[in-house]
């Protein structure tokens, strides 16, 4: 089973913490992947346009090894990384050990160990919030968000080639339209963003594609990439918690 398929299947089952087999099993390779992603900065620019975290409290849900925590910590007042996999909790804690404004805790999207209405921004990047099945996490994010706070979900766009084509090869039954409708019905706005992944060596590129896809699809992807870089599409989904009472 491909790594993407494992995550989607667990999401549909409503699992409390979704396995992220790529970073759980190969954290060193996933660190290479994180460094290769978004080399144009398009994702961070889009997030900054949609969400203001300067001087505010942020929670990064499914923070993994904490790769994105330093970026938030540059301007946020406080940053909390939440991660269900204990080895990654330790890695993220070590990464941020010298920054007193950042805390890393064990927890899940369904059980965020923070008080009600305690953060202005909840961020999740390619973690848990994949579509139907993530409703408990949406409720929990609303609980920890203060009125007017924003949940920002960054996920891959399966419609965007070539990466989306490779994803669909491993997920032939995946219904992108149903996923889009799910988030639209839940009140999210969607911004589609193209950025690039760029690697230092072909060996790095091949290793990363090897942990993201089944063996056959990874081999096809490696053969189709010329050089060290390729475009990748993302969806940046945002939903703001209402500031007042909702009358129905």
What are these regions (language model features)?
Residues 135-147:
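A short glycine-rich, Lys/Arg-flanked "PGG" loop and its adjoining helix->strand segment in the class I
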Residues 1-56, 67-71, 150-180, 212:
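Conserved class I S-adenosyl-L-methionine
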Residues 56, 77, 120:
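Conserved acidic residues
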Residues 120-134:
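A short SAM/SAH-binding and catalytic strip from SAM-dependent methyltransferases
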Residues 59, 64-111:
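Class I SAM-dependent methyltransferase SAM/SAH-binding core
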Residues 110-121:
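A short acidic, Gly/Pro-enriched loop at the edge of an enzyme's catalytic core
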Residues 65, 184, 189-248:
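Conserved Class I S-adenosyl-L-methionine
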């Amino acid at each position: 089973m491909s790594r993407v398929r494992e995550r989607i299947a667990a999401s549909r089952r409503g699992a409390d913490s979704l396995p992220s087999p790529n970073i759980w099993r190969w954290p060193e390779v996933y660190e290479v992947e994180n460094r290769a992603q978004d080399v144009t900065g398009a994702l961070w620019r889009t997030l900054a346009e949609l969400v203001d975290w300067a001087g505010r409290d942020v929670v990064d849900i499914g923070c993994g090894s904490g790769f994105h925590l330093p970026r938030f910590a540059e301007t946020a007042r406080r940053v909390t990384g939440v991660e269900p996999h204990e080895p990654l909790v330790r890695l993220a804690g070590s990464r941020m050990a010298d920054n007193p404004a950042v805390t890393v805790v064990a927890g899940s999207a369904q059980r965020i160990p923070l008080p009600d209405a305690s953060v202005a921004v909840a961020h999740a990047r390619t973690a848990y919030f994949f579509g139907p099945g993530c409703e408990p996490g949406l409720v929990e994010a609303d609980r920890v968000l203060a009125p007017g706070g924003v949940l920002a979900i960054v996920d891959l766009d399966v419609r965007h080639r070539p990466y989306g084509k490779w994803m669909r090869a491993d997920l032939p039954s995946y219904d992108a339209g149903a996923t889009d409708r799910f988030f639209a019905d839940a009140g999210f706005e969607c911004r589609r963003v193209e950025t690039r992944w760029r690697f230092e060596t072909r060996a790095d590129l091949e290793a990363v594609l090897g942990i993201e896809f089944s063996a056959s699809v990874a081999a096809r992807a490696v053969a189709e990439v010329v050089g060290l870089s390729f475009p990748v599409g993302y969806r940046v989904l945002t939903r703001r918690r209402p500031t007042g009472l909702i009358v129905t």
